[in-house]
Amino acid sequence: MSYQITINNNTTSNVQNIVIADPNLASLGENVVFSDSQGPLSSLYVYDGVWVVKLRSPLSPGQSITITASSGTPNIDPTIALYYNNGSSYSNLTLVGSPTVSIVQDFGGYAISAYASGDFFLVASPTGFTPSSSRLLVVDRWATTPTSLDAVGLRLYADTNDWFGVVRKYINGAQNVSIEQKISGTYSVVNEIDISQFAAFTDPLVMYLSINGSTANVKVYKQGSNIGTVSGNYSTTPYGNPSMAGYGTVDKHYANFIVLPYEPDPQVTVTPISSPSPTPTPTPTPTPTPTYDITYVVFDVTPSPTPTPTLTSTPTPTPTPTYDITYVIFDVTPSPTPTPTPTPTPTPTPTPTSTTSSNI
């Protein structure tokens, strides 16, 4: 099974690293090879149906390219989502496709964050970069697993050299989420959002951070539904060591962030990912019912023979014979009454006469 994916760069920038999210790819599992006309491309598995694919060369504005996704041995490049390509800047990860799956993946302790510049998503390592983002979408792997711990955090780190702010999720008996922000080296609770509507925390939470001047707006989403917004100031003071060293074992867990595409790029388009069209099964042609051209009918008192159809079809039922009655003669002469034979009268038997004699 293979899928054809056509990418159209309708932007004004070059794009090379593409996030392809489509449930059709989930049927291929992790063993997916992406290829262009010259052969396999480098890729990075994110989650079922979601991959980061590095094009062989940047796709210029107005250009299109068709790649193929099929079962096979992938050409995994673990640096795609971690390091920049040209040594001076990070390549944009342009989201294409139809992201309908929740992306939750542990990258083995690597600290991965994402930010958007314009309509592009960027994935980078925490080795230091200057953010210019207004949007940030990440999700923590633990957010999908119920736990007995009091704090099972989700943090967004931010400053000019490292990350954008600090957000932490607390779970307590009241089922509240505490949004915390790193300000001047200390934590301060900006607001609390009641998430009692969440079902046992088995669904991932998405923290959406918007930077506007000195205000950080944090929105919490569950399956795309906004349940609240908090605001507060953020600090541009570098937070900790950009290499994440010394953060402690718990904070290393917090570094297991991945991209959760929420706002598809409206400018870079992709054709629907689909398999080749199957050959349609021909519909059998029905056998036509034979028709007859009747030019004349001869009526005779002899039953008509059954016509033999000229085409092979359902046999025509034998018609009931018809007769042409030409005339009927009625004889009005009464039939003679037969003369009855007279019954002979029986001759009566004579009564015998007795003679009496007397002797005096």
From Swiss-Prot:
Keyword field contains 4Fe-4S: no
Region annotation 3 Thr-Pro repeats regions and two near identical repeats: where it falls in the sequence: 278-353
Placement of Thr-Pro(N) repeats on the sequence: 270-291, 302-322, 333-353
Region (Disordered) residue spans: 269-289, 332-360
Record has Repeat as a keyword: yes
Key words, A-Z: Repeat
UniProt feature, compositional bias: Pro residues: 275-289, 335-351
Coiled coil: none
Sequence repeat residue intervals: 292-301, 323-332
Name assigned to this protein: Viral protein TPX
Organism: Thermoproteus tenax virus 1 (strain KRA1)
